[in-house]
């Protein structure tokens, strides 16, 4: 399947969407931390590197350096997708996805999840967003996903052999990266053949581990 996007609504600048893997990860992390840890947001460079290299709730797991993250932040800033916030103790970074891509809060959260974890089902997005946005049900998730698709920011990936549900993926990466991501997910089997309740429990445990990692990172940075 090729990556194609059609838009019935106004679309953001195409150049702004040609993001590499590091830029995709940075935006996803900034969106996530704004929603789950507002008291430490915007993020320092050190905190953002830790978030990017987090072992849970990330697909794929990455090992980025401060130099890589810093360079990508500047590139994103030039596209209007991040902003440097000067501070008395440390400079911090925030995303501008809502303004740069003209998204409402629900769409920002879904975009962040897709940036962090690749193609996902509606139920996965509903479960994983519970700490970030109050979606009443899966229909609300689908409605916002359809609006992202109409903007050319996401696409529906029909279920493949061995999969039970369709998936949705973002279209913010460069074409080559998106094709690689799509190919990898199409070849992957359904995540566990466990029940929805079991998968929900796994997501809950991942969220708890992520929260512990965030707390540890804050303690370490406080000692710097």
UniProtKB/Swiss-Prot annotation:
Domain of life, per lineage: Bacteria
InterPro entries, sorted: DUF480, WH-like_DNA-bd_sf, WH_DNA-bd_sf
A matching Pfam family: DUF480
Entry's family note: Belongs to the UPF0502 family.
Protein name: UPF0502 protein Psyr_2419
Naturally occurring in which organism (per UniProt): Pseudomonas syringae pv. syringae (strain B728a)
Source species taxonomy: Bacteria, Pseudomonadati, Pseudomonadota, Gammaproteobacteria, Pseudomonadales
